[in-house]
Swiss-Prot record:
Membrane topology, as annotated: Multi-pass membrane protein
Pathway info: Glycan biosynthesis; hyaluronan biosynthesis
Protein's gene: hasA
Signal peptide range in chain numbering: none
Keywords: Capsule biogenesis/degradation, Cell membrane, Glycosyltransferase, Membrane, Transferase, Transmembrane, Transmembrane helix, Virulence
Entry-linked InterPro entries: Glyco_trans_2-like (IPR001173), Nucleotide-diphossugar_trans (IPR029044)
CDD domains associated with the record: CESA_like
Gene Ontology BP, a term: hyaluronan biosynthetic process
Top-rank taxon: Bacteria
Name under which the protein is recorded: Hyaluronan synthase
């Protein structure tokens, strides 16, 4: 990134944080909201500060036998074909490309793939297509490929994702460090222009990777290697394959949360990192109902795998601390909102209510300050995501926690992304 853009981001962040500190301390002082504000500002400064120091891995990747694994379930046919083409176009050679259909009721996509592979024999010699007779879930679809490959490195790609031609090559640069066992790339919404929801989702993704994972990568402990574009050493996958397929939580089988589960296996062995130069675009829900179902699944996975991460406090305290911070921030926000609604609202202190909303707006701008130089107009929509986060996603997160034993969340139904 050019130096003037970095300078603009840093100066903007300092200005926003200064306003945030003033609003928080002057209006809320030592109240519950004020205490939450102090912790939030501290956490923001730590994350943004670390992300400013982040640098991607450089050098030339070593020679590896790499297998790409693409599980699919009721996927849009053209979307899956575009995914395969993007994997075939990688600048780093792949030994095997597995496309595993997980018992889809709509077979249009896998039929199109089979026709393409049979027609384009020269470029698809290393493509292995498999149809499962029954739907067992993404983990079992991936496992079918893992069990049959002798690859040194596994590349995981979601079936609705376009990965840039140099994505694998860039990811593998991180493996020049032998202590790194998993790496993830940078994710954006392919259908960002569809509507307001997809634009807000793209803003959130850019923050989740460009800030959160960049900060965590600096400590060598990103919490989630994202499914659309990640690599794992063989030592992460194969010894844990049975655990992966048969994971249970509170006595019930687990079928979702595969990304975080594999990341936890990698954390047990060494470092997990983010490579900003490895990029991909993925389809995101454009309907609120589908979006909330997705968030519910992710929330339950977050809480389940957070318990596992916190248990690592002795063996890997940094991972535990990152996780504890995320959980504590969620809990404190719920308490702060409750205090504001049942205390300040009763007193009809409209100034403080307005100040609280202003803080939410400014926090949203602070979180997404990197986005300012990428899409300036869309950056101004960040406060809308702040409102969505506060009034929709936080209550949903609480609901997810309260219903974490409900197994219905484990069923992922594919939705059409484009009309």
């Amino acid at each position: 990134m050019p130096i003037f853009k970095k300078t603009l981001i840093v100066l903007s962040f300092i200005c926003l944080i200064s306003i945030l500190i003033y609003l928080n301390m002057y209006l809320f002082g030592t109240s519950t909201v004020g205490i939450y504000g102090v912790i939030l500002i501290t956490y923001l400064v730590i994350k943004l500060g670390l992300s400013f120091l982040y640098e991607p891995f450089k050098g030339n990747p070593h020679d590896y036998k790499v297998a790409a694994v693409i599980p699919s379930y009721n996927e849009d046919a053209e979307s899956l074909l575009e995914t395969l083409k993007s994997v075939l176009a990688q600048t780093y050679p792949l030994s095997e490309i597995y496309i595993v259909d997980d018992g889809s009721s709509n077979t249009d996509a896998i039929q199109l793939i089979e026709e393409y592979v049979n027609r384009e024999v020269d470029i698809c010699r290393n493509v292995i297509v498999h149809r499962s007779l029954v739907n067992k879930g993404k983990r079992h679809a991936q496992a079918w490929a893992f069990e049959r490959s002798d690859a040194d490195v596994f590349l995981t790609v979601d079936s609705d994702t376009y990965i840039y031609p140099n994505a694998l090559e860039e990811l593998l640069k991180s493996f020049n460090d032998e202590t790194v066992y998993a790496a993830t790339g940078h994710l954006n919404a392919r259908n960002r222009q569809t509507n307001l929801l997809t634009r807000l989702t793209d803003i959130r993704y850019d923050n989740a990777f460009g800030v959160e994972r960049a900060a965590q990568s600096l400590t060598g402990n990103i919490l989630v290697c994202s499914g659309p574009l990640s690599i794992y050493r063989r030592e992460v996958i194969i010894p844990n394959l049975e655990r992966y397929k048969n994971q249970t939580f509170l006595g019930l089988p687990v079928s979702i949360g595969d990304d975080r589960c594999l990341t936890n296996y990698a954390i047990d062995l060494g470092r997990t990192v983010y490579q900003s130069t490895a990029r991909c675009d993925t389809d995101v829900p454009f309907q609120l109902k589908s979006y909330l179902k997705q968030q519910n699944r992710w929330n339950k996975s977050f809480f389940r795998e957070s318990i596992i991460s916190v248990k690592k406090i002795l063996s890997n305290p940094i991972v535990a601390l990152w996780t504890i911070f995320e959980v504590v921030m969620f809990m404190m926000l719920i308490v702060a909102i409750g205090n504001l609604l049942f205390n300040q609202a009763i007193q009809l202190d409209l100034i403080k209510l307005f100040a609280f909303l202003s803080i939410i707006f400014i926090v949203a701008l602070c979180r997404n300050v990197h986005y300012m130089v990428k899409h300036p107009a869309s950056f101004l929509l960040s406060p809308l995501y702040g409102i969505l986060h506060l009034f929709v996603l936080q209550p949903l997160k609480l609901y997810s926690l309260c219903t974490i034993k409900n197994t219905e969340w484990g069923t992922r139904k594919k939705v059409t992304i484009f009309k």
